[in-house]
Regions:
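Winged helix-turn-helix DNA-binding recognition segment
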Residues: 17, 21-22, 32-87
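Pre-recognition alpha-helix immediately N-terminal to the DNA-recognition helix
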Residues: 25-29
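Long, low-complexity, charged/polar intrinsically disordered regions in eukaryotic proteins
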Residues: 1-13
Length: 87
């Protein structure tokens, strides 16, 4: 059995100029949380523990940018609760 290791240091998102640094940080957190999962769920409260200054609207706007640039797909199924899939 082969074990997968989490390595996001060489990911193409770091060189993408269309993505804001805050969105890159969110992507890295979501990537680590959803590692080896098809679909993951997250609440804005868990994100706010890591990124103190982010609001639900700011988080949603960053997810829209990431979705537009084909890094993930998300859906807000309740206020502050999201499910997402990383490509």
């Amino acid at each position: 059995m082969r074990v997968k290791h989490l390595d996001i240091s060489n990911h193409k998102i770091w060189k993408d100029k269309n993505i804001k640094p805050e969105a890159k940080e969110i992507y890295a957190y979501l990537f680590a949380e959803g590692f080896e999962r098809t679909i993951s769920h997250i609440s804005i409260g868990r994100i706010q523990r890591e990124l103190k200054s982010i609001t639900n609207i700011g988080f949603r706007n960053n997810l829209k940018i990431l979705e537009k640039n084909k890094y993930l797909v998300y859906k807000e199924y309740d206020t502050g609760l999201y499910k997402y899939h990383i490509y």
